[in-house]
Amino acid sequence: SDRNFLRF
């Protein structure tokens, strides 16, 4: 999901 980039 796009949540993968939310880690930043």
Swiss-Prot record:
GO CC annotations on file: extracellular region
Keyword check for Lipoprotein: no
Subcellular location: Secreted
Alphabetical GO biological process terms: neuropeptide signaling pathway
Primary localization: secreted
Family stated for the protein in its record: Belongs to the FARP (FMRFamide related peptide) family.
Protein name: FMRFamide-like neuropeptide 3
